Amino acid sequence: MGNEDFLNKIIHGDSMKLLDKLEENSIDVVLTDPPYFLDKMDNNWDDDTVSSTDNHYAVKSLPAGMKFDRKHGIKFYEWYFEIAKKIKKILKPGGFFFSFSSPRLYHRMGCAVDDAKLLIRDCFIWLYSMNQPKAMSLNHFIDKMEVEEEVKEKIKDELDGWKTPKVKSCFEPILMAQKKQDKTYLNNILKHGVGLFNTKVKIGEDMFPANVMKIEEGHEILDRYFLVPKPDKEEKGEFNTHKTVKPLKICEYLIKLSAFSDNAIILDPFVGSGTTAVAAKKLNKKFIGIDVNKEYVEIAKKRLENV
């Protein structure tokens, strides 16, 4: 099986297995949003496990009731290290790897990609404000204390406003890495058609490409450069049940920034509802999308039909 069996298709399957079937040194850009936790199953999941769950979706943060443990981060590192090694193998020399992450696990992702011998180039920041604070009051636990009510009320008054150490999350990091180029940048772009950034690409007005992007209106000056629309129902599709759909504009921006060749292949090994593939198709680039979730594969295919 070669790339021709994957090109411009959404494939249902496990990327840990399918990435080995892609040709070496053949992918221009990898743009993906990997799963971190899947219904309290960490990364020990497969198609049968996903299909047997009631709510089979990948989420960025911990599922309700699940406590974060260092083991989760370690398991994620071990899993993504193997993924990153496979990605390095199939990327062209100078090819780019963009991976959405979360503040809590970005360091594990960065170490996994770095240890796979890909070059960490930068970190893009996607800013937003539409998110709920997750800090928790301790009143519920105070109520369970076996002490007099007056003592409970006194403790509550003393701890008024003091909650668990969790702030409102307002950004999402996007790791940017690159496979080592073949000799010089000039040699690499002429031989492999990848490895440079298109500095004419802007999110806003009259500014060199930046690594900060925001999706809501705010400061007037920032809005000139970093405004990225939040995906609405029309963009996602009324049928789209995916929980963490990324803005199409961000994916388009990263592809336009990094994909030089007209024949560039954009790979998303965790394609979800297909935003990366939709962006690539809109920009007349070739794409490969892979996902273990059958429901998301069908959603992605349906979204592509509307492009």
Report residues per predicted region.
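A short helix-to-beta-strand connector/capping loop
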Residues: 3-9
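Enriched but not universal
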Residues: 1-2, 296
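Short conserved loop adjoining the S-adenosyl-L-methionine
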Residues: 18-24
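Conserved SAM/SAH-binding loop
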Residues: 12-17
